[in-house]
Amino acid sequence: MSCSCNTAALRIFVRNVANIQVPSSQQVTPRALPGFRRQMTTSLPFHTRSLHTTRAARSDSTEAVSEETSTATEKPKAPKLLFRKTHAPANPNWMGEQPPRRQDHKPRELKKARRDHGAHASQEEGDHTEPTKKKNRWRDLPEEERRELYAKMGKEMPDEAERQARKQEQQQQKLRASLEEPKKHNPAHPRRESWQHQKNALKEKFPEGWKPLKKLSPDALEGIRALHKQFPEEYTTEVLSNKFQVSPEAIRRILKSKWRPDPEEEIERQERWFKRGKQIWQRYAELGVKPPKKWREQGIRPNKYWKEGEEKTFKDRQIANVKLHRSLL
């Protein structure tokens, strides 16, 4: 080997294992192997070594050799741990010691004392009190003993069938009461708002949907009455409803009503319906529909920029709009 420190460590290990003393004269110094040094220097890269490290290595080797001669006859010991010594003194019993505990244990002691005192008091009370016997149920007793007990009380023993019938009737009454009571704070049946009740009522009243009443002019109302009065067999309610595009119920109400407006109310109605008709035929004129002579005299003219080609393309839409506005008259 090239270093004395390595040979010293190996020698100590072999001596401890085989209990054989190795003389120090067999130590081979690095100076005795010049060829080996040349080989190492050529193969390995060059490393600088400080003066302090070389001196420390030599001192370690000399100390190891001196220790061999002194400890040859002694018993082998375990190899020392190569740790750096600290300033604190070594304590061999540090594993057995435990950290100091807190001396103040008053809360735990108080809890334990209270628990022990309560258990002792309950045990004393249990010793003084007599154990309560379980009350025997009459239902478990035989029939003869039950008859005797009822006789002592001055009552007649009820029949088993009657008792079962009475019990079943009570259960049915409870079930009815639970069904009749309103369910409060039940997520499955939450409380309904007033508008929800109104919506359900409208659905029941108008299952096909809401159909608003058609507004008929005063002249149309008078014409319905006159036609039905002059030709009752020909102009029935069904024929009039198809002619004026209203429900038969509306025709019946018109024929049944006996209300007639006053002269002042009649004037107001005529003025209101005249304004309404004027607005409707203005919309028709914008679509290119030629209004009647009555409304043309009022200054309503069809749209001048309406082209003939567009009139053909929008013919179906015009017919639909005319039907819609006629329903409003």
From Swiss-Prot:
| Chief site of localization | mitochondrion
Residue ranges of the region described as Disordered: 47-144, 157-199
UniProt keywords, alphabetically: Mitochondrion, Transit peptide
Using the UniProt entry, state which stretch of residues is the transit peptide.
1-59
Q: Supply one GO CC term from the record.
A: mitochondrion
Basic residues composition-biased segments? 103-115
Presence of the UniProt keyword Ion transport in the record? no
Q: Does the entry feature the keyword Transport, yes or no? A: no
Q: Which residue positions does the secretion signal occupy?
A: none
Q: Compositionally biased, Low complexity: which spans?
A: 62-73
Indicate the family of this protein. Belongs to the RRG9 family.
What name does UniProt use for this protein? Required for respiratory growth protein 9, mitochondrial
Origin organism of this chain?
Answer: Neurospora crassa (strain ATCC 24698 / 74-OR23-1A / CBS 708.71 / DSM 1257 / FGSC 987)
